[in-house]
Amino acid sequence: MSKLVLATGNQGKVKEMASLLADFGFDVVAQSDFNVSSVAETGTTFIENAIIKARHAAKETGLPAIADDSGLEVDFLQGAPGIYSARFAGEDATDQQNLEKLLADMEGVPAEQRTARFHCVLVMMRHENDPTPLVCHGSWEGSILTQAQGENGFGYDPVFWVPEDQCASAQLESPRKKELSHRGKALQKLFAALKDA
């Protein structure tokens, strides 16, 4: 099994990504196990931020690193929260505060205007100076509910309506979420790229 550093401090992402990557034969180690310092996400796109995080983790650990930059894009909000999804309600906002801000911003918006999607960009760098990092993107179409539903998942999962299963993302069991989610789709692409490499 290949060891891989997961460049995130988000424990929800660590749990979900470790489970997904284990399916592909990777032994995932969280960057917190190496005391990797935080790095400013100064990019203006999901791709730029994922590269910044993967390069930083690879540099500090000496191991291959994978970084995820993901977020929710709401059409009514002209794509917000986007790359600012984790800090939509402020720099140190909790998942609950971000979710509450989203619901407040969407209050009174009719169902047909509540379309949204999750995006996930995964970047894998074999080392800090990798000139050809693997970059994979996945998206997941849905809409924004008027109130939270479900106990599973993290972030915006309780308000993200999944049309395929007629429930909130937070109501999905883990195997089904892996199959449908933006992160699961991006990881499938990453695994296919690794097999071809």
Curated annotation (Swiss-Prot):
GO cellular component, one term: cytosol
GO BP, sorted A to Z: nucleotide metabolic process; purine nucleoside triphosphate catabolic process
Record-listed substrate binding positions: 8-13, 70, 154-157, 177, 182-183
Signal peptide residues on this chain, from the entry's feature table: none
Positions annotated to bind Mg(2+): 69
Molecular function (Gene Ontology), one example: ribonucleoside triphosphate phosphatase activity
Record-annotated active site: 69 (proton acceptor)
A Pfam family it matches: Ham1p_like
Group of enzyme by EC: hydrolase
Recorded catalytic activity of this chain's protein: XTP + H2O = XMP + diphosphate + H(+); dITP + H2O = dIMP + diphosphate + H(+); ITP + H2O = IMP + diphosphate + H(+)
Coiled-coil ranges per UniProt: none
Cofactor note: Binds 1 Mg(2+) ion per subunit.
InterPro entries assigned to the protein according to its UniProt record, in alphabetical order: dITP/XTP_pyrophosphatase, ITPase-like_fam, RdgB/HAM1
Enzyme Commission number(s): 3.6.1.66
Chain's role: Pyrophosphatase that catalyzes the hydrolysis of nucleoside triphosphates to their monophosphate derivatives, with a high preference for the non-canonical purine nucleotides XTP (xanthosine triphosphate), dITP (deoxyinosine triphosphate) and ITP. Seems to function as a house-cleaning enzyme that removes non-canonical purine nucleotides from the nucleotide pool, thus preventing their incorporation into DNA/RNA and avoiding chromosomal lesions.
Oligomer and partners: Homodimer.
Family designation: Belongs to the HAM1 NTPase family.
UniProt-recorded name of the protein: dITP/XTP pyrophosphatase
Protein source organism: Photobacterium profundum (strain SS9)
